[in-house]
Each structure stands twice: as structure tokens, then as C-alpha cells.
């Protein structure tokens, strides 16, 4: 092969000494793999992570401009206040744990378990999620309306396997040490902190035992249980639904969607078994865990020792500016999105992106129409769904109005709670209302893309339209290999093991002929088996059931862009 100069995707990352027919992976990126090292402040290195870090640099420049001339930019003062309050470690250290004193006092005031639902609601209003998780999102079987979903929660570790598998025993021991350190920082004696840690782990292990695994949570049908509000009140009386939701939602909905009913039943038994003082310790831990990164330096560093270093392998924390930027992304990110689009997104490139999307859609449709194992009736419905699939590119037509948030450059925790409650009020206020099809659930600078099943659409934010994934000045072949494979990946999600359960309107219903669904499941099982056979580390294999949707999308994405 004739050697070429580096272009957008950097040929120097390839290993041209390898025959692509023997080892395409190393041919494509072998040299990059050999010379790349995971940064000490990152758990991973990849094109996505490198581009994300570059994007954060751009966001930092925007924020520094807001600090210098806040009146020059929309939401300039708000962004400047949030950034400055985060990096002001002198004030944070002086305040110590005082910003969360009012939350801890509310926990200490708990006298009876019947008061627990109201306390859970108070904690949620103050950005502390505990036993259960609320999600106001489109009803999976009536995607035109927002419904209130209730899901399992209550765990500090990523999922239930961390509490029960022998392989992860060392992780649990480190987790216990981290809880002890955090309670010691808060002022507990060694004995008190040890008892608190043992209590937290005991309660969370009980919760893990009644929780579904990540693999089980992927199945949309098994995690959809529509229940009238009256039935919920009777079945889960211990939650005192009215007290639980009165301060969170403007009006109780007629029905709820309960993701895991057996979890709520089991949780009631756990709460009944545990004494009130131990429940208080559990709740205090979740306050400390949820707020440590917004408090003093020692609290943030202590949390990182386990949740950063131990769980992810990240050796050191990101620099302060990076963490401050991330804080803004997670609170008032839409304000930053608007300025990012103005400064960095080449709107003229959007036309080329649309053309590229249309060409990949054409290839996808042609291939779908030729599927030999699918009956014509199912194929016709699949094509209808594909033709109805929407595409959002770049950024939303409108951005959020943050004018009601009164910020201060000296009050990090106050800024956080105001932003959190602003968003909570916004999303909870839409329950039972019509879904806003124009809404973007991600920020414009996000270096990613996704398929939204309930909207039957793919979303391609402005942030993904950067080298090495996309460059409007380069040959189309390079862009098809970059952003093209990502677009194909997201289109395929509409027909993977879960996406295929949604119809063209974004509603979960069985639109496949029975025989076709059985054939699809057989083929999906083959993909699951293939990936489950891959050994990542000695004795550790890929969980093909958990990764199935992504594996199907990867295979489809590369096929269609080629």
C-alpha cells in the first residue's frame, strides 16, 4: 500500500505492516494502541475520551470568557458564578460540612418509620436519592404522554453483583474502609464509624439481594408494570404515596409505572426489619456520598479514593477546572450548550452531515428490504418504522430559560441545590402532559450519539461532528468510516433486541409475526454466545447478554456505512 500523509483520522495510528484480512483491528489502530497510555486522571483512553477532553478545553475557554465579561454572554453571570464557586476551595474548606447540616438534622429528627416517606421526599428535593428512584419519562406503551416511573435504587456500588460475588470481595472491603473514612471526617469516633460502615453494607447488601441485575433491567417489557395510583397505595402502603409525592409532583397522576414491583415489596420488609437508628445511618451515608464533591477538599478526596481510584482505576483526580466544568455540565449544561454552538459549531457542515445521514439511511433501507428470513408483513412494518425514524442533528431549536436561578460565586452548594430543584420542578411538572418532541435530553457539546426509542429517532449532537469522527473538508470515505459508522450504529439500535420491541410511534408493542420474532431471537442468541465466548482477562468473559444491544448495533453500523 502506498503511504499517505496524516489526515483527519491520522494514518499514523494505523499499522500498515499488518494485512487487514488477517487482523483488521490492529491494521486499523494497532500503532495507536501501542503508543497510547491511559492518563493518570482518566480510567480509559479512546477516541471518544480524547475528543471529550478537547471539548472540555473549549468549554473552559467559554467559561473563562464569562468570568471576564459576564454581561457579554447569555447566562454569563450564572455560568461564572457556578464555575467560581466550585473552584473556590478556600471557602469550601472553611464551610466544611456546614452546607449539609440542615439535611443531617432532618434525618436526626426522624422519630418513627411512618415519617420515612416524607423524609425520602425531602432528601430527593435536596439531591439525595436513597431507596427508590423516580423517573418522569414517556410512557413506554403510550409514548405521547409523560408518566412517572418508580425504579429500584438504594445502592452505592454500580450493581448487585458487587455485593454478592466472591471475585469482588476486595472491592467490598475497600468500600467499607471508605465509609469509615467519610464518617470519621464527619466527626464520628472510630468505633462509631466502623459500626456505621457495617450497618450501611448490611442494609445495602439486603437491598442488592432484592434488586434486578443490569442484564435483567435491559428488558423493557419485564420492567414495565402499569399500576393505578389507588392500587399502588394499597399494595405498598408503607410508602405513604401521598406524603412521598406531594412535595415532588404538582399533582398525583392517575397511574404509575413500577419497574420492579418485587423490589418495593422486599424493601418494605427490609425497612420493617431494620431499627430506625440504623436506617438513619444508612441515610446519612447517602447524604455524605451524594454531596462530598461539593464540600471541602478532604471530603472530595476521600470519596475519590474509592469511587474514582478503586472502582475505575483512575490514579488521580481531574484538574479543578475540569471538575468545575463537569459540575456545570451536570447542573446548567444547557446554558453552556448555547454558547458552545455559537462559538464552535460549523453550521455549514450540517448540510454535509444531513447528506451523509440520508445516504446511510438509503443503504440501511435497501438492506432491510432484502432480509431473507423475515416475512413480508413484518418487513413492511419494519420499513414503516424505519421511514418514520426521525433525526436530530446539532442542537435544539430552543434552550432552557435559567433566569429564575439566583446564583452566587460564594455558595457552591446553594447553586447546586437551586439548579437541581429547577430541573426537578421542570421534569416533574410535565407528568401526565404531552411529550415535547422537540426536546433534546442531551447537551449540544456531547461527544456521543444515541437512539431514542420512545421518540423513534436518532440524535447526533454538535459535539460528535469533530475530527476524527467528522471533518467536512475531508473525503467522504473518511467521514463514512468515522461518523458514518456511529450513525449506522444508532439506526441499528432501532432494531436491536430491545429497540425492535418499539413500533414506529415509539410505543412498546409486538408488531413482529411470531415466527419472525423467534428467528430474530435465535440470531440474537448467536451474537450473545459469540461475545460471551470472548475472554477479556484470564477467567473473565464478556457478558454477552448485557452487551447484546451494543454488539448488534456495532455490527449493523459498520455494515451500513461500508
Provide a role label for each language-model segment:
Residues 15, 135-138, 447-451:
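Short, surface-exposed beta-strand/loop micro-motifs that present aromatic residues
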Residues 1-2, 200, 206, 230, ...:
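Intrinsically disordered, low-complexity linker/terminal regions across diverse proteins
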Residues 27-41, 180-192, 388-390, 468, ...:
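Short amphipathic alpha-helical segments with coiled-coil-like heptad repeat character
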Residues 41-63, 191-207, 479-485:
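Short secondary-structure subsegments characteristic of cysteine-rich extracellular domains
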Residues 2-5, 19-22, 27-93:
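Active-site-surrounding "flap" and adjacent substrate/cofactor-binding loops of secreted or lumenal enzymes
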Residues 63-355, 359:
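Noncatalytic, helix-rich "gating/capping" subdomain that lines the substrate-entry/channel surface
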Residues 11-12, 16-20:
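A charge-rich, low-complexity, intrinsically flexible signal that marks solvent-exposed coils, linkers
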Residues 19-21, 126-129, 141-144, 273, ...:
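Short, well-ordered loop/turn elements at secondary-structure boundaries
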Amino acid at each position: 500500500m502506498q503511504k499517505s500523509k496524516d489526515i483527519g483520522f491520522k494514518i499514523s495510528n494505523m499499522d500498515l505492516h499488518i494485512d487487514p484480512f488477517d487482523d483488521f483491528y490492529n491494521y486499523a489502530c494497532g500503532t495507536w494502541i501501542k503508543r497510547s497510555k491511559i492518563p493518570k486522571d482518566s480510567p480509559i483512553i479512546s477516541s471518544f475520551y480524547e475528543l471529550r477532553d478537547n471539548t472540555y478545553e473549549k468549554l473552559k475557554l467559554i467559561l473563562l470568557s464569562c468570568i471576564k465579561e459576564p454581561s457579554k454572554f447569555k447566562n454569563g453571570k450564572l455560568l461564572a458564578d457556578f464555575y467560581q464557586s466550585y473552584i473556590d476551595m478556600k471557602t469550601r474548606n472553611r464551610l466544611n460540612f456546614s452546607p449539609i447540616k440542615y439535611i443531617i438534622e432532618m434525618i436526626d429528627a426522624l422519630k418513627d418509620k411512618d415519617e420515612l416517606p416524607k423524609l425520602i421526599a425531602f432528601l430527593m428535593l435536596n439531591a439525595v436519592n436513597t431507596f427508590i428512584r423516580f423517573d418522569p419519562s414517556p410512557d413506554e406503551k403510550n409514548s405521547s404522554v409523560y408518566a412517572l416511573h418508580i425504579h429500584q435504587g438504594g445502592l452505592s456500588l454500580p450493581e448487585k453483583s458487587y455485593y454478592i460475588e466472591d471475585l469482588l470481595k476486595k472491592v467490598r472491603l475497600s468500600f467499607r474502609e471508605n465509609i469509615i473514612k467519610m464518617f470519621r471526617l464527619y466527626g464520628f469516633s472510630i468505633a462509631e464509624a466502623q459500626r456505621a460502615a457495617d450497618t450501611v453494607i448490611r442494609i445495602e447488601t439486603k437491598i442488592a439481594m432484592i434488586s434486578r441485575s443490569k442484564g435483567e433491567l435491559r428488558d423493557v417489557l419485564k420492567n414495565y408494570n402499569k399500576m393505578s395510583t389507588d392500587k399502588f397505595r394499597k399494595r405498598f402502603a408503607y410508602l405513604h404515596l401521598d406524603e412521598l409525592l406531594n412535595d415532588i409532583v404538582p399533582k398525583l397522576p392517575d397511574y404509575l409505572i413500577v419497574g420492579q414491583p418485587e423490589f418495593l415489596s422486599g424493601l418494605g420488609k427490609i425497612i420493617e426489619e431494620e431499627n430506625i437508628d440504623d436506617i438513619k445511618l444508612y441515610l446519612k451515608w447517602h447524604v455524605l456520598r451524594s454531596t462530598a464533591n461539593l464540600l471541602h477538599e478532604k471530603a472530595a478526596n476521600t470519596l475519590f479514593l474509592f469511587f474514582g481510584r478503586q472502582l475505575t482505576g483512575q490514579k488521580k483526580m481531574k484538574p479543578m477546572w475540569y471538575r468545575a466544568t463537569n459540575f456545570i455540565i451536570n447542573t446548567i449544561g444547557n446554558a453552556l450548550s448555547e454558547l458552545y454552538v455559537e462559538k464552535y459549531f460549523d453550521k455549514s457542515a450540517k448540510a454535509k452531515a444531513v447528506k451523509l445521514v440520508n445516504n446511510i439511511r438509503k443503504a440501511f433501507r435497501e438492506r432491510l428490504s432484502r432480509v431473507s428470513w423475515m416475512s413480508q408483513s413484518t418487513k413492511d412494518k419494519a420499513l414503516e418504522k424505519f421511514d418514520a425514524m426521525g433525526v436530530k442533528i446539532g442542537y435544539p431549536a430552543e434552550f432552557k430559560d435559567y433566569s429564575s436561578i439566583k446564583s452566587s460565586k460564594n455558595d457552591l452548594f446553594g447553586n447546586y441545590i437551586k439548579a437541581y430543584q429547577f430541573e426537578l420542578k421542570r421534569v416533574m411538572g410535565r407528568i401526565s402532559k404531552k411529550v415535547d418532541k422537540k426536546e433534546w435530553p442531551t447537551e449540544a457539546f456531547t461527544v456521543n450519539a444515541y437512539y431514542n426509542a420512545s421518540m423513534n429517532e436518532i440524535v447526533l449532537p454538535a459535539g460528535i461532528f469533530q475530527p476524527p469522527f467528522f471533518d467536512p473538508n475531508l473525503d467522504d470515505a473518511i467521514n463514512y468510516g468515522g461518523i458514518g459508522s456511529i450513525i449506522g450504529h444508532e439506526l441499528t439500535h432501532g432494531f436491536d433486541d430491545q429497540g425492535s420491541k418499539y413500533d414506529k410511534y415509539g410505543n412498546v408493542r409486538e408488531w413482529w409475526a411470531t415466527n419472525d420474532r423467534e428467528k430474530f431471537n435465535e440470531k440474537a442468541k448467536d451474537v450473545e454466545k459469540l461475545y460471551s465466548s470472548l475472554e477479556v482477562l484470564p477467567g473473565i468473559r464478556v457478558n454477552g447478554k448485557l452487551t447484546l444491544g451494543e454488539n448488534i448495533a456495532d455490527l449493523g453500523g459498520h455494515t451500513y456505512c461500508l
